[in-house]
Amino acid sequence: MNKLNLGILAHVDAGKTSLTERLLHRTGVIDEVGSVDAGTTTTDSMELERQRGITIRSAVATFVLDDLKVNLIDTPGHSDFISEVERALGVLDGAVLVVSAVEGVQPQTRILMRTLRRLGIPTLVFVNKIDRGGARPDGVLREIRDRLTPAAVALSAVADAGTPRARAIALGPDTDPDFAVRVGELLADHDDAFLTAYLDEEHVLTEKEYAEELAAQTARGLVHPVYFGSALTGEGLDHLVHGIRELLPSVHASQDAPLRATVFKVDRGARGEAVAYLRLVSGTLGTRDSVTLHRVDHTGRVTEHAGRITALRVFEHGSATSETRATAGDIAQAWGLKDVRVGDRAGHLDGPPPRNFFAPPSLETVIRPERPEEAGRLHAALRMLDEQDPSIDLRQDEENAAGAVVRLYGEVQKEILGSTLAESFGVRVRFDPTRTVCIEKPVGTGEALIELDTRTHNYFWGAPWVCASDRPSPARAITFRLAVELGSLPLAFHKAIEETVHTTLRHGLYGWQVTDCAVTLTRTGVRSPVSAADDFRKANARLVLMDALGRAGTEVHEPVSSFELEVPAARLSPVLAKLAELGATPGVPTAEGDVFRLEGTMPTSLVHDFNQRVPGLTQGEGVFLAEHRGYRPAVGQPPVRPRPEGPNPLNRDEYILHVLKRV
C-alpha cells in the first residue's frame, strides 16, 4: 500500500481542526464529527487544547483512501506555536492549506505558504466556510493568486455562497467551457514539453492528459489546486478527497534500504517514559531493534547516542495500534529511547542536517515557582517540556537558582506554558517580563596564550595554547579547527577542549550567544600524568578562549524583521508617523486603488507592539505581516545579559580560585 504523510496547516480559526474531523468522519475513522467549541475533537487531545479551542501540539491520525494510507498531521494555527509546524514540515509528503472564505488570506497564511513553496512541498488549498455569512469565494481566490501563489488553479466553484445552501461545484470541461484554456495556459507556463503539445494544432489534448500533467506539476510544487467547501457541513469534501488521492505524491519507499527516520515529536507515556514519534523515510524498525540517534546542535555539531526499541506502535485507521515492525513511509511511536529529543535522526545519516524553516524564538523570559520549595519540580517539568520543544532552549537563570530561562515566540505561548506547568505538573509559576534575544559577533581576531605550571608558581598543571577568533562561513556557525598535530594531546583532551569551546561561547563578552566565530587551537602541551582532561574542560579552554575573544572584541546584534503593511489611503500618515516613532525603516509606499502597500524593516522587539496597534491606526482595515530577516548591530548602548552563576572566566584570578579551590 502506498503512503502519504499529509499536513493540515492554516491561520488560527480558519477551520483546520474541523476539516481534520470531517476527513476522519468521511473516511470512516470516527462515527461522529467532533466540535472544537465543545472540546470533542479527535486530534486536540490535550485538556488545554479543548479548553481554549486551539491546537497547541501536532497530532497524528490515519485513514485509508482505496489503496492509499494517509497519515494526517494536524498542526497548530497560532503563530506562537510555529515550532510545532516546523517539526511537522520536515516529515510531510504533501499539505492542505486551509483559508477562510470570510476572513480570506491572513498574515500567518502567507508565512505558511511561503515556506511550503520554498520547500517545494506539494500543496492543495481548501477555502473553508463557504456557508458562513460574508463568504466571498471569488474575492478570496483573487487574494490567493495575489498574495499566496500566482499558480493557483480553481478546481471547484461555489453556488449560493454565504448561505446554508452553499454548494461546491466541481470544475471541468463538462461544467466550465473555459476550463481547458484556463488550466492549459497555467500548466504550459511551467513545462516546455506540455507547452509544445498544448500549441500543437494537429493534436487536441485529452482530459486524461490534462489530468496527468496537473498531477505531475502539483507533485512538483509548481501549481496549487484550489477547492471550496465547508468543514462544518461536509460540502465540497469529496472534491478535496479526490485531489488528495489523485494529485498529491504518495510514497512507496524501499524497505530493503538502511533505516532512515526523523523524530518530529516526543511525548510522555503513562509512567513518565519518553515516547518518540518517528517518520520512517526508508528501511524498517521493530521492537528490540538497536538504533543509533544522530543529533545536530545549534552550532552544527553532530553527536551520536544509542538506544533500543522496547515497544512500537504504528498509526493505523485513526489511532496507534501495536505492531512488530514499522516500514518506510510509516509514522510510528517508539518506546525505549531514553535520551531521545525532537530533531534526532535515527539509523543511517546521509546528507546535511535539516535546517530551520522558521526563525528561532526572538524573546526570552525567566520562570520562577511561586513557592521556592517547588524549584526542583519546576526544573524537572521544564526538562520534560524541553524534550518536547527544544526551541524553548531551557537554561538556568543566571541570577536565581530557583528560576529558569526559556525562549518564546510570543505572549500566548507564555500563557500556555504557565497553564501547562500548573495543570499538568502542579507547579504554579510567575514570569518576568519578556526580553529580546540578541547575539554577539566577533569584530576582529584575537590570540591568547596561557601557561600553567606549578613549578612557576601557577595554579595547576595545564597546556600552553593559542586561540584565534574571527569571522568564518557559513553564517551563525561556530567552527573549531586544529592547527596542531592530533597526537599532541590525548584524544580525550581534544574532545574536552572542543566541547568547552561550544559551551563557553553560549555567553560572550556581553552575555549573549556568540555566532559567526571560528576558533583555532594553535599550541598545546601536557605534563603527564598530572594534567587531566578536566583541566582543559574547566579552566584552560574557558580562560584562553574568553581572553582571545576579549582581544578580538564582539558586537551585539539585535534581531530584525521585514514587514509588509497594507493601509487605507486616509490612514497612511498616522501609520508612517508611528513607524518613525518606533524606529522602523519603511520603504516608499505604493498605491493600489484606495490602499497603500508598504514594506520595510524594524527591530523584532517592536513587532508585537506594532501589530497590536495596527487595528486602531487603520480603523480595523490594515493588514500587517512580519518575518524574521536576520540581525543588525544594536543601536546605542549594547544590551547586556547577566552571566551564569559561578566563576566568571573574564576574571582570570577569580575563575582559577573558584575552579581549583586554591590560590
Curated annotation (Swiss-Prot):
Residues 1-252 form the tr-type G domain. The keyword Protein biosynthesis applies. The keyword S-adenosyl-L-methionine does not apply. One of its GO terms (biological process) is response to antibiotic. PROSITE patterns: G_TR_1 (PS00301), G_TR_2 (PS51722). Keywords: Antibiotic resistance, GTP-binding, Nucleotide-binding, Protein biosynthesis. GO terms for molecular function: GTP binding; GTPase activity. GTP binds at residues 10-17, 74-78, 128-131. Pfam families: EFG_C, EFG_IV, GTP_EFTU. Abolishes the inhibitory effect of oxytetracycline on protein synthesis by a non-covalent modification of the ribosomes. Belongs to the TRAFAC class translation factor GTPase superfamily. Classic translation factor GTPase family. TetM/TetO subfamily. NCBIfam families: 47473_otr, small_GTP, tet_protect. This is Oxytetracycline resistance protein.
